[in-house]
Amino acid sequence: MTTTQEPRPHDSADLRSWLWGGVFLGLGLGGFFDGIVLHQILQWHHLLSEVYLPTTLENLRINTVADGFFHAATWVFTLIGLALLWRGTRGQHAPWGTPALIGALLFGWGLFNAAEGLVNHQLLQIHHVRPGPNQVLYDVGFLVWGAAMLIVGWVLMRRPWGGSVRA
């Protein structure tokens, strides 16, 4: 004999889980973009390229391993985000609309850029977006891009048709 449960309305815990799921997923996607596009495709920098200049095979190996750990961390953020999104829906329709989810993703990605830009580029200076001429412009541009995503993400999450962060 099978029983069916009555669908229940989403509670505030579902909304918080969904919000944090989108933010963590955005953190992971931001990290993947940085690692895949800037580290691998464009080869502008590695995670530790200002500490271990990738001019020798040994230093390139160290940077590649560090990049691998960086990718593993972004993968964990992505998995946490997916798990929280799943938990927030509990097999039902999502408690928010698509714009709110896009807002949470942008907010998470912007949070990644802000943390990466302030900590790794400015505070620790373990690498820069694109070392060399105009290095400061690339670093500032990265921060501005992150701030724009934070603002747009926040606005999208706060829109009436997108749900409310206050839930």
Region roles according to the model:
Residues 1-14:
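Short, Lys/Arg-rich, polar N-terminal cytosolic tail immediately upstream
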Residues 45-62:
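Perimembrane loop-to-helix junctions flanking transmembrane segments
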Residues 83-108, 163-167:
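Cytoplasmic juxtamembrane regions at transmembrane-helix boundaries
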